[in-house]
Amino acid sequence: MSDQATTLKIKPLGDRILVKREEEASTARGGIILPDTAKKKQDRAEVLALGTGKKDDKGQQLPFEVQVGDIVLIDKYSGQELTVEGEEYVIVQMSEVIAVLQ
């Protein structure tokens, strides 16, 4: 678990993953400062913590396809959003992760 997730004491369960979306630039290319309402949700996020994992039909633990620290691509509207101490996080299922960016 990352230091940030440990400090917050957030532990996803099952095949869920705690991520933090990357921040949208607050200034447009022309130098115009964008209000929060004009910013779009980012679909890139950093993996902060992994749940306990999922088991197959035989009870074998299935490995996660991501690791803490990976930058992943998720759907803009997926997961459960939560705000802790003014910071926004999202808990998504492994199946909602579209790709790992390298």
Curated annotation (Swiss-Prot):
Q: Does the keyword Chaperone apply?
A: yes
Q: Which GO terms describe its molecular function?
A: ATP binding; metal ion binding; protein folding chaperone; protein-folding chaperone binding; unfolded protein binding
Family annotation (Pfam families): Cpn10
Q: Where are the transmembrane segments?
A: none
Q: Which cysteines are joined by disulfide bonds?
A: none
Which of UniProt's keywords are assigned here? Answer: Chaperone, Cytoplasm, Stress response
Cellular localisation: Cytoplasm
InterPro entries assigned to the protein according to its UniProt record, in alphabetical order: Chaperonin_GroES, Chaperonin_GroES_sf, Chaprnonin_Cpn10_CS, GroES-like_sf
Report the record's Gene Ontology biological process terms: chaperone cofactor-dependent protein refolding
Instruction: Reply yes or no: does the keyword Cytoplasm apply.
Output: yes
Role according to the record: Together with the chaperonin GroEL, plays an essential role in assisting protein folding. The GroEL-GroES system forms a nano-cage that allows encapsulation of the non-native substrate proteins and provides a physical environment optimized to promote and accelerate protein folding. GroES binds to the apical surface of the GroEL ring, thereby capping the opening of the GroEL channel.
Which HAMAP family does the record match to this protein? CH10 (MF_00580)
SUBUNIT field: Heptamer of 7 subunits arranged in a ring. Interacts with the chaperonin GroEL.
Name of the protein in question: Co-chaperonin GroES
From what organism does this protein derive?
Chlamydia muridarum (strain MoPn / Nigg)
Could you read off the lineage of the organism from its UniProt record?
Answer: Bacteria, Pseudomonadati, Chlamydiota, Chlamydiia, Chlamydiales
